[in-house]
Amino acid sequence: VTVQSTPATVGAWHWFAPTEVHWRPRDYWQPGTKVTVTANLRGLDAGNDVWGLGDFGYAFTIGEKHVSTIDTVSHQMTVTANDQVVHTYPISAGRAKNPTISGVLVVRYRQYDVLMDSQSIGIPRSSPDGYYEHVYWDTAVSTSGYFVHSAPWSMWAQGSSNVSHGCVNLSPARAQEFYEFSQIGDIVQVTGSSLAADASDGEGDWQIPFGQFANAGAGASTPAGTARPGGGL
C-alpha cells in the first residue's frame, strides 16, 4: 500500500489492529494537496489460502483549511477557514455525567436526519433522561456517536451551561450553517472536557503524538511518495 502526494508530505503508518493500518501526515494537510492511495493486492498471499484478487486506488484533493475549536468551559465554538474566524457559536456540550469527548477530532460524515435512541448509550427510553427522536443537521465528529447537531430544546443553555448527553448542541440555524460549511476530514478540536477521546476508537490519528504514531508497528515516518506499511443528544 502506498500514499503519494503533490507536494510531497512527510507522514507515517500506524497499526491500530492486525487488520487495520492508518497513514497520517506529520502536520495537517496543506490545502490543494493532491493525494493518491494505491493498494497493490492482486496475487498477494494473505495466508490461510487467501489471495488478493485485484488492485485498488483512490485519488482526492485536500480542500480548504477548516479548523473548529469547541471550548466546553466557556460554552463557545469558534470556526475558522484558512486561519480566519468565520463563525462564533454559543454551544451546550455534554453534562457532567455524559461529557463530550475532548481532543483533536475530525468530521467523519454528515447526515441531515439521525434517529437518536438513548438505549444505545444504556439509558432506557422510559427514563427521565431517555429519548427517541429525529435530530437534524448532524455533523459526526467521532465513530462512537458524538455529533455537532441542531438542538432547539437546549437553546436556553447554549452559551451558558452543558446539558447534553455528550453531543455538541447548536441552534437549528447554526447547526445547518456548520453542517453546510463542513468537509469530511475537517479538524474539530474539543477542550475542557474530562473525557479524552479514545485513541483506539477511530479518533486516534491526531490523539497520538506523531513520534509515537510513527514508531508503532509500521516504523519511522517517510515522505508520502515512499510510505509503506511494514510490519447523544
What would you call each of these model-derived segments?
Residues G57-A81, P99-G103:
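Low-complexity, Pro/Ser/Thr- and charge-rich linker/hinge segments at domain boundaries
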Residues E64, S102, V114, S118-L233:
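Exported/periplasmic cell-wall-interacting domains
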Residues T6, P18, R26-Y28, K34, ...:
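Solvent-exposed coil/turn segments that connect beta secondary-structure elements
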